[in-house]
Amino acid sequence: MSSKILDEKKPRTVALVTLGCARNETDSEELAGRLAADGWQLVTNPADAEIAVINTCGFIESAKKDSIDALIQAHSLKANGVTKAVVAVGCMAERYGTELAQEMSETDAILSFDDYKDISERLNTIIEGGKIKTHVPKDRRTLLPIAPVDRATSRDLAKGKEINPLGTVPRKRLDNAPIAPLKIASGCDRRCSFCAIPYFRGSFISRKPAEIIEEAKWLADNGVTELYLVSENTTSFGKDFGDLKMMEKMLSY
């Protein structure tokens, strides 16, 4: 059997490096689930990966610096002959997009949240030398109706547009800790002058209780004994379903 055929059958390797908050941790595990389902081999050490995906944070200056340092460090691994590409995802990538691409030649691609549903396809294109159009930032608050109660319907109708790009997908745990985050919602409707999160994370949207409970059971089956709830604004949970007591009801299931 030729070495070419062997290489074609060998799984491609990817490392996910996560910076920032627990929300990014859940995003990374959902990306890992998508990649594993498509046959990618997940490795812990970026030096062992053909492609390093850096899940960046863009909230405060120190977090931005950490993200930039991580991208530069990942780029330096190309000298080892294993790492072929460095990809930025996450909040800083979403928030700055084209600006980050202009300033960071160390990255081979900067992907948006909208690319998450096709993450395997995107990484395959990049690793094969193809080019991905650089993400152009937009105000994600405009992607859903202003009235929260209209969002549950619009979300279901717009699944093809992947407004909530991760939705319900199998997570793949990236550690064996007995404690794990559980995402209950995305985005925020607050307009705090010091916070840009609604601009790049979008308007508030709750996950359906059935989805949350299903994922909680899955985490328990995988050795998790303690969960902590994650969202940009937990106190708003359920308002887009017209029920601010939805948390109380869910916990009584």
Pin down the residues of each PLM region.
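Short glycine/threonine-rich loop-to-helix capping motif typified by GTGT followed
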Residues: 238-244
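Proteins enriched for Cys/Gly/acidic motifs involved in redox and nucleic-acid/cofactor modification
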Residues: 1-237
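Alpha-helix-loop-beta-strand connector modules within alpha/beta enzyme cores
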Residues: 244-253
